[in-house]
């Protein structure tokens, strides 16, 4: 995208807006349009409005997008594009009202207005209006400022304001709390998405501001043992009228995808200095790719179509993979880096340690599924494959030193793959000697229905023993682990598969790993990681999550992985049943409530702090952590694969400074990280 705004040669006006249907169904079934009414659906409202602004940038008419999380819970999105049309539409009402009140009304249906766009522009913004209590629009176009307000989706009347030579649109909305489970936006979630959009649109500036940071939320560090004197009424009044503190971030990447790859690899050791960067254009198609190999063992390839994150890949990724595998094998054979008698390197061998971003722009995209996470255009595969064949061949020929390093890494990966295959076969042979082909230490459940079955992966033999005794053996299976499993972030697959604990987990789940993974063979639809509530327990949980993320990611993507929440405290009352607390705050609350109710706590061991799961007997473990009617399970989600990839690299990788910096920044944040 050129940083300079394109002249509005193409007509984007009332005639460009096409209506397909009305808004009636949105409030009745919001999930059909935004996925859910939870936190994810709430943030989807922002994405819809931001997509509009970014589409103006993609078309060459906007250079800056400003997003503000307003103090009162609303959101403001502004761009310096052409402005939403205000002229009277063929339907007899102002065009802005058509865009805001009619579903499937937008300029994206008119190829003259937008050659390429992410999703159908007018669709999203009308859905935002339908699911908001109030929406305000301010427009600069046709020589004037214009404004319109929508109360419960109904327009109050378009107003013409002062003359102006500027152009652009500003949309403010307040999500309806009667529709959404929460109306609180997460700053980091918004920041990650906007950063992604800035990477994908070279030269675009996106500013994010959060006005919700008030004086009460600012905590100063304690620098002495002497507390400050209480503030006077006048001082407090002055503070309340002072401007609120805000936090803001600006995203601007002149290098575009090259900067994106640098960002992905910043916590990893690149094995060649230059970043491979190329693009190509065809009829109705464009592709841009940036890539660089690192010394790690995990592939980190992220794909986008019209700036939409295609988590499930699609034809653009297929074309890239096919070309990369072909080019590297040909180069390796031609340069005798691979002997003629040697088998070809596989795609997995070549992509080990690869960080890449693939961005295509398609005039008529076909997305598979409602969530638009897989690109289906068959012609895109051959287009991307052709461009990649030409450009990658040129890069390998022009950079023989770097090319040799890449090929040698792939050859080393192939050797590890062969060793891993032998390790897999060993796992299978070993499994066959166990009863039913399952690990000997697995206490399986009686149910044969995976949908009703749960597997508890438990830290330590002692806790495993209590879990086996306390479980409901009809549907709960127990797999105890002895000590810490291998850190898969720092080990190649052949070493990983030699680890006894990893073998037991893979065999128990039944799905296989990597290219052999088959979710249809999953033996338990709930996989519960149960570890001590201390630092060691959290480390073991992270090791397990890293294994699942790197080797069996669809388990997380399909919502099968959970974290158990064992209690931290047991309160023993005299002449009353004991109570369990899962945090210091809950302990204090239960204690205060009990004492107010006239209960008496045991004097000697009234409050017991559990140091580990092994301290609980079978009955306590069932009552607090395993009984479906009372237990607390945290589902592990994967909202952003790139962010999760970065998180695991920081927490479990080789870069000590990056890990220390992350821990320092997040030490005060006691919320769980949804990875």
UniProtKB/Swiss-Prot annotation:
Q: What does the Swiss-Prot or TrEMBL cofactor note state?
A: Mg(2+) required for DNA supercoiling, DNA relaxation, DNA cleavage and DNA decatenation, Mn(2+) substitutes for relaxation but not supercoiling or cleavage activity. Ca(2+) does not substitute for supercoiling activity.
Impact after mutating residue 169 to A: Increased resistance to pyrrolamides and novobiocin, however genome not sequenced
Subcellular location(s) per record? Cytoplasm
Where does the chain bind Mg(2+) 1? 459, 532
- Cellular component GO terms held in the UniProt record: chromosome; cytoplasm; peptidoglycan-based cell wall; plasma membrane
> What does the UniProt record note about how this protein's activity is regulated?
DNA supercoiling inhibited by (fluoro)quinoline antibiotics such as sparfloxacin and levofloxacin, which usually act on GyrA subunit. DNA supercoiling inhibited by the coumarin antibiotic novobiocin which acts on GyrB. Quinolones lead to gyrase-mediated dsDNA cleavage while preventing reclosure. DNA supercoiling activity inhibited by aminopyrazinamide and pyrrolamide derivatives, probably via effects on the GyrB subunit. DNA relaxation inhibited by ATP and its analogs.
GO molecular function of the protein, one example? DNA negative supercoiling activity
**Result, substituting residue 157 to S:** Increased resistance to aminopyrazinamides, however genome not sequenced
Record site feature (Interaction with DNA), residues: 484, 487
Anything else known: When the enzyme transiently cleaves DNA a phosphotyrosine bond is formed between GyrA and DNA. In the presence of quinolones this intermediate can be trapped and is used as an indicator of drug toxicity. DNA gyrase is intrinsically more resistant to fluoroquinolone drugs than in E.coli, mutating it to resemble E.coli increases its susceptibility to fluoroquinolones (most quinolone-resistant mutations are in the GyrA subunit). Gyrase from M.tuberculosis is usually assayed in the presence of potassium glutamate (KGlu); KGlu stimulates supercoiling but inhibits DNA relaxation activity, and has concentration-dependent effects on GyrA-box mutants.
Which protein, by its recorded name, is this? DNA gyrase subunit B
Lineage of source species: Bacteria, Bacillati, Actinomycetota, Actinomycetes, Mycobacteriales
Encoded by which gene?
Answer: gyrB
